[in-house]
Regions:
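Contiguous beta-strand segments within globular domains
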Residues: 179-214, 219, 239-241
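Surface-exposed loop/edge segments in extracytoplasmic proteins
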Residues: 113-115, 222-229, 282
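Short beta-strand elements
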Residues: 282-297
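Surface-exposed coil/turn segments at beta-strand junctions on protein surfaces, enriched
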Residues: 40, 196, 209, 233-235, ...
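Glycine-centered tight-turn motifs at strand-turn-strand junctions
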Residues: 225-264
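Conserved structural position at the C-terminal beta-strand
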Residues: 275-277
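Beta-propeller blade termini and top-face loops
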Residues: 1-191, 198-201
Length: 299
């Protein structure tokens, strides 16, 4: 059976009821753009509206209920931006992603404050969004500007306790050691493709204040340092790319001035990542490197 929730607020003539529920009033003459039941709480649901089609307005309409639809809260915070889509983080219930007519916004506190998510994505209409839970990727489809993917790996650990620390190393996402193969005998017209991303993965960390020196040490399980990466020193969220290679070894001749540009790639397995800030080891996390699943299937 279906229940008309909007009828709790308006009579048949569209006038507000005097006995309407407390809290925010859901609009009855705006376009419903998304209904999103929470994956974390059975009584929580998000609803977004847009008045652009019916009233040519830019007002944001974002509502949430925590009691199964009995009462609602307005979490739009006065934004003037037609809303198209809303997604809930699969691992962190405090995080919501908002697709609007002017780009992507995110909240880390269930709608108390919304911020622009990325400067790299264009400020155009976001038609649809989807989260790939395993890879922690946010896929975004826009109107006229293409398809984008955002890495939201560290967001699942975004908590007040993390931001109060001087430095924090987020749990690394598994990295697949892809086998790069070159296709031959095909022209562009026969096989259209886009360049593959580089083999490796990003490591994320947080700095409460600007640091003098930041390094990330990659170690094997015996504690041997196999790679040393230099990180950004600015405060806030930082990321460093590791190409799955060990430190290059020196080569002989010319007093050792000629060195290998890249060391060998690591084998699949478990490694340790240590965040070093201003010479002090702050935190260590484990990192899993997996083999290309295609190669595993062949075995």
């Amino acid at each position: 059976t279906w229940v008309n929730i909007t009828a709790k607020f308006y009579d048949k003539r569209g006038r507000l009821r005097k006995d309407r529920p407390k809290g925010a009033v859901l609009p009855y003459d705006r376009w419903v753009t998304r209904v999103l039941p929470s994956a974390h709480d059975v009584d929580t649901c998000y609803v977004t509206y847009s008045g652009y089609r019916t009233h040519n307005e830019d007002t944001s309409y974002i509502f949430v209920t925590h009691d199964g639809g009995k009462t609602w809260q307005d979490i739009s915070q006065g934004m003037m931006n037609p809303v198209r889509d809303i997604e809930e983080d699969p691992d962190n219930p405090d995080i919501l992603y908002l697709g609007t007519d002017y780009g992507i916004f995110v909240t880390f506190d269930q709608g108390k404050k919304w911020v622009k998510m990325s400067e790299s994505a264009p400020d155009v209409i976001v038609m649809d969004m989807a989260i790939q839970k395993r890879e922690r990727d946010l896929a975004i489809a826009t109107y006229g500007r293409g398809f984008f993917i955002a890495d939201i790996q560290p967001f699942k650990e975004f908590k007040k306790a993390v931001f109060e620390k001087e430095a924090y190393l987020f749990e690394p996402q598994r990295i697949v050691k892809w086998n790069m193969m070159e296709r031959r005998g095909e022209t562009y017209g026969e096989f259209a493709y886009t360049p593959n991303p580089p083999v490796g993965g990003y490591l994320y960390y947080w700095l409460k204040d600007k640091a003098e020196k930041v390094k990330l040490l990659i170690k094997d399980l015996e504690g041997n340092v196999i790679q040393e990466l230099t990180g950004g020193k600015a405060k806030g969220l930082q990321k460093v790319f590791w190409n799955l290679r060990k430190k290059p070894k020196e080569q002989g001749g010319m007093a050792g001035r000629f060195r290998r540009r890249m060391g060998p790639m690591v084998e699949a397995g478990v490694y340790k990542v240590t965040l070093v800030v201003n010479g002090q080891e702050v935190m260590t996390q484990k990192l899993k490197v997996e083999s290309d699943p295609i190669l595993l299937d062949k075995d």
